[in-house]
């Protein structure tokens, strides 16, 4: 299937993000260039590297939202990380290579899901057979002659890394007929609420040291997971829920994980995208403390990843040569030139995102596919209340949000969420007890509820 064109990508982003056309175009072109590169001969492909993007702009103007929506649009492995979470090598914390390992995990998840779809019908059939056997169990054999054989089979299975072998059973004609009847009812969906006892793999217990080890790039549970036998527990569940769990287990048995890992590594390396947020927070612009040294160290650790290197993952080595990196930051107290020169050079495309105007706020309230106003209307619809905003009310909300941003810290579109929550506080509180009907939010109501916010000079409680 042909990839989405740059114009189609921008059109999709327009459904959720107001303005910032330059940023949308840059991202769309970079994404489509991946498709162009894939059409070229291999000897040419290897010399064409992605043009990484650096987005700079005030907080709340859409940088992170562009990344979030990209993940929904592109059919490629995508991870978003925060630069402030990383520490340079030698310090306690996450090392920068963990972002590449996260991308590998995401690629495996995507490919695994695709492979599961291919074997889903077969897995459902096998799960239904298991359910029939559980609902109408056979007669278990228990004689001295086969006890030694069962013991040998059990030992062989455990040594091979499998679980306990299934017990042999005897199926009489009566049981066979009952199973045929139950199988027919299962197919017709008549037994979905019947309870059945199944054995499922026990979920791993939370390890207090797990988070610390994970931050240091060491996932011991994953490393040892395949070596240790899987413990199973019995659960009593309705047939519908039991089938889902059994289908998941059957799908894992039917797919070839070696192929999945190989495809995933190839996809992550050729079409993966890593979005690095808050990159301005690791600049060394502030020289007043020793933190600048550590921040510059993080930049130097990120540099080889962005330049192109090979990172070891639990699925195999992953090359970052053709991964697209998109970095973003507000740069309120620093500027892109405060990054080390080598790292600046690895982000050749610079995009400046503009501060939001009052007209932008009006569009943000109304235009996006799931705008804030539409969200509140849907929430109150659950109580049987029809919420309506007049055009004048929307204009006034945008005006107040813009004024508060100008008078205090400018937090962009995030200010609208604070303003709307204050405006609709009473309606949301009384909503469940109101009789079904329509509530119209007018300009006068907005002024009544929010006038104090504009008049009061101490607006700290309205800062997110």
From Swiss-Prot:
The keyword Isomerase appears for this protein: no
Keywords noted in UniProt: ATP-binding, Chaperone, Cytoplasm, Nucleotide-binding
Organism: Lactobacillus delbrueckii subsp. bulgaricus (strain ATCC BAA-365 / Lb-18)
Keyword NAD: no
Taxonomic lineage of the native organism: Bacteria, Bacillati, Bacillota, Bacilli, Lactobacillales
GO CC, one annotated term: HslUV protease complex
Function per UniProt: ATPase subunit of a proteasome-like degradation complex; this subunit has chaperone activity. The binding of ATP and its subsequent hydrolysis by HslU are essential for unfolding of protein substrates subsequently hydrolyzed by HslV. HslU recognizes the N-terminal part of its protein substrates and unfolds these before they are guided to HslV for hydrolysis.
Residues that bind ATP: 18, 60-65, 277, 342, 414
Family label: Belongs to the ClpX chaperone family. HslU subfamily.
InterPro entries referenced in this protein's UniProt entry, alphabetically: AAA+_ATPase (IPR003593), ATP-dep_Clp_protease_ClpX (IPR050052), ATPase_AAA_core (IPR003959), Clp_ATPase_C (IPR019489), HslU (IPR004491), P-loop_NTPase (IPR027417)
Region forming the signal peptide: none
GO biological process, one term: protein unfolding
Protein name: ATP-dependent protease ATPase subunit HslU
Pfam families: AAA, AAA_2, ClpB_D2-small
The protein's assembly and partners: A double ring-shaped homohexamer of HslV is capped on each side by a ring-shaped HslU homohexamer. The assembly of the HslU/HslV complex is dependent on binding of ATP.
GO MF annotation: an example: peptidase activity
Subcellular location: Cytoplasm
